[in-house]
Amino acid sequence: MEAVRFAVAVVLVFCYVTSSNAQMTSPPSGGAGGDAHSLPCIQKLMPCQPYLHLATPPPATCCMPLNEIVAKDATCLCAVFNNVDMLKSLNLTKENALDLPKACGAKADVSLCKTSAGTNSSSTPPATPKTPPASSTSTGTGSGSTGNAAPSTAKPTSSAPAINFGGLSFASAVVATLFF
């Protein structure tokens, strides 16, 4: 029984350390330009990270999600492309950030990103469907409600990783209570 308690304690400590490290690395990417809404799509691209600076062609595990994002999620593509801090953290520039899609045969149209003129504007398309309810609430300030819609859209998604890690901590506490 003592061995089981020790094993559970080790697992709980491991989960806590893992969630703490993930929380420490999450805010810089979310805080650098408000692109926290793009994190789910960034996570799909994690298999591509080793191939960012290699001449070796990336495998299908990298190219399939990358091609899907290029084809279907221009908002994510622009959020990454326009986030200079994120590119710097990966030792990329805007110019060589396009090398990976080319290696996968994807045609990334970054002219859409230039049209959106920045990371805050690139978050506007997802907020556009949510803007009419906000403007119907405050009819006199339609432009003010549009400005408020984008930050409110980014805040819930930026807190989503914290909720997930909070749930992990809560689950750890429940398991500890059951076994100890």
From Swiss-Prot:
Lipidation (GPI-anchor amidated serine): 158
Keyword line: Cell membrane, Disulfide bond, Glycoprotein, GPI-anchor, Hydrolase, Lipoprotein, Membrane, Protease, Signal
InterPro entries: Bifun_inhib/LTP/seed_sf (IPR036312), Bifunc_inhib/LTP/seed_store (IPR016140), LTSS (IPR043325)
GO cellular component, one term: plasma membrane
CDD domains: AAI_LTSS
Signal peptide per UniProt: 1-22
Single GO molecular function: peptidase activity
Principal subcellular localisation of the protein: membrane
Disulfide pairings: 41-78, 48-62, 63-104, 76-113
Residue positions assigned to the propeptide: 159-180
BP term (GO), one: proteolysis
Free-text disruption phenotype from the record: Inability to limit tetrazolium salt uptake in seeds, development of hair-like structures on seeds, altered pollen morphologies, deformed or collapsed, and decreased levels of omega-hydroxy fatty acids in seed coats.
Membrane topology: Lipid-anchor; GPI-anchor
Location in the cell: Cell membrane
Region (Disordered): 116-156
Annotated Low complexity bias: 116-125, 133-156
Organ and tissue specificity: Restricted to stamen, pollen and sporophytic tissues. Also detected, at low levels, in stems and leaves.
Stored Gene3D superfamilies: Plant lipid-transfer and hydrophobic proteins (1.10.110.10)
Glycosylation sites: 91, 120
Role of this protein: Lipid transfer protein involved in seed and ovule maturation and development, probably by regulating the fatty acids homeostasis during suberin and sporopollenin biosynthesis or deposition.
Family (UniProt): Belongs to the plant LTP family.
Name the UniProt record assigns to this protein: Non-specific lipid transfer protein GPI-anchored 3
Species annotation: Arabidopsis thaliana
